[in-house]
């Protein structure tokens, strides 16, 4: 019922009528789409299982399962239209913070063993060997979904931004915003794209990938100020009271195409956290050295094996013996970056605290992906046809939009888990001659 109020608030029934006027079909697209969205939130499963689950709703389906699969093809063909319409209609439910747009990418795996269409072998976020498809997602400043796109699993995700952003500019009427992303989607081309018109950018920056001169400046513990009052500080003389503060310094970072500001922040609390994590990893690396064993494959950059090196020692005429040792140079190099974080922006005159606050909001889009993958079970994907796969992700996107808008209407007082649990507990029973009666606690 609560999801239904969001559905009709977004005027998706009207959107379905507009779509019907362009296609020849007899089934009730509005009923199918709404049921797909509700079941994705309440009982995420396959399309056939969702159809069975929908039969338990107050208004059970009057359509058949084969109608659902036919509707998926229609929904896929209208994917861009539906996204732009729900964005415009979402203003009927409240203002959108569309002056800040967060962008990120993730991928979803398929239960197949061969590449097919856009389902390509690529770098899976979950380290799975299956073919994947990638998704680019924009959210507004409140973490409410705005638009998404799909692209092949083997494509560089940096190139996914321009087509989707162009769609937003042309179809959504949204052309004045600050683009915000992590360093992985902050190539110079993507920054230049948001250096034009009424757009700007705030992106994280890898300190290790800075030009040598700028990297050396960033690593120096001099020139920092306390963020709260701009008071200059000596990072080597911080007291215990100072360790909960955040410190920063900034400088121009100019390229042939861009005038930017580079902001370096230092957090003593984050530095202590990184040091503690690394101490555990060093302990595990020391055990590897003692045991004389080292994994050949390193799956991630935080693997303790990165601190283990090897050298071959030979005696004349004898086969080389491999000796493992702890790489103290590698450890010392990593320690230099403890507590440091970098952000780049073309908002040269804006307050540093405001810029950092926008950048910190990126957690919301990461939470969107977690909700889609874990709570809405958007993966693995079992569909084969490209159009039906598009429709699957469209319904996942719309389900996420409904869920976020509902949570906002509740002033964000519930966690994802709490709100889902509450929605799933809302049940009714059909009492003879009395109609439906609620059987849940408010």
Placement of each model-derived feature along the sequence:
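Anion-binding and metal-coordination hotspots
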Residues: 1, 10-442
């Amino acid at each position: 019922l609560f999801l239904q109020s969001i559905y009709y608030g977004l005027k998706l029934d009207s959107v379905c009528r507009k779509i019907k006027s362009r296609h020849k079909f007899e089934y009730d697209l509005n009923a199918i789409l709404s049921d797909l969205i509700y079941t994705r939130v309440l009982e995420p499963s396959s399309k056939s299982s969702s159809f069975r689950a929908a039969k338990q709703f107050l208004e059970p389906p009057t359509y058949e399962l084969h109608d659902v699969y036919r509707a998926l093809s229609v929904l896929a063909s209208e994917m861009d239209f539906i996204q732009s319409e729900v964005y415009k209609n979402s203003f009927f439910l409240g203002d959108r913070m569309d002056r800040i747009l967060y962008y990120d990418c993730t991928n979803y795996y398929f239960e197949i063993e061969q590449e097919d269409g856009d389902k390509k072998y690529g770098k899976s976020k979950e380290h799975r060997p299956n073919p994947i498809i990638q998704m680019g997602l924009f959210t507004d400043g409140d973490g409410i979904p705005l638009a998404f796109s799909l692209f092949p699993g083997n494509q560089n995700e940096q190139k996914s931004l321009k087509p989707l952003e162009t769609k937003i500019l042309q179809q959504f009427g949204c052309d004045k915003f600050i683009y915000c992303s992590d360093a992985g989607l902050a190539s110079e081309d993507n920054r230049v794209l948001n250096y034009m018109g009424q757009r700007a950018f705030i992106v994280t920056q890898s300190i290790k990938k800075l030009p040598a001169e700028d990297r050396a400046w960033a690593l120096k513990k001099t020139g920092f100020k306390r963020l709260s009052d701009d008071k200059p500080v000596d990072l080597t003389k911080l007291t215990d009271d100072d360790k909960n503060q955040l410190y920063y310094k900034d400088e121009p970072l100019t390229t042939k195409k861009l005038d930017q500001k580079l902001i370096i922040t230092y957090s003593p609390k984050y530095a202590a956290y990184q040091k503690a994590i690394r101490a555990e990893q060093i302990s595990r690396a020391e055990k590897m050295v003692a045991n004389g064993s080292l994994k050949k494959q390193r799956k991630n950059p935080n693997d303790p094996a990165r601190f283990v090196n090897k050298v071959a020692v030979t005696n004349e005429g004898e086969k080389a013996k491999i000796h493992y040792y702890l790489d103290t140079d590698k450890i010392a190099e990593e320690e230099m970056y403890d507590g440091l974080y970098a952000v780049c922006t073309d908002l040269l005159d804006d307050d540093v605290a405001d810029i950092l606050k926008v950048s910190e909001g990126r957690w919301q889009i990461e939470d969107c992906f977690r909700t889609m993958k874990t709570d809405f079970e958007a993966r693995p994907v079992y569909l084969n046809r490209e159009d039906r796969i598009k429709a699957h992700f469209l319904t996942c996107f719309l389900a996420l939009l409904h869920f976020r808008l509902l949570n906002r209407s509740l002033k964000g007082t519930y966690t994802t888990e709490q709100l889902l649990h509450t929605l799933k507990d809302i049940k009714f029973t059909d009492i003879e001659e009395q109609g439906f009666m609620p059987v849940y606690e408010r």
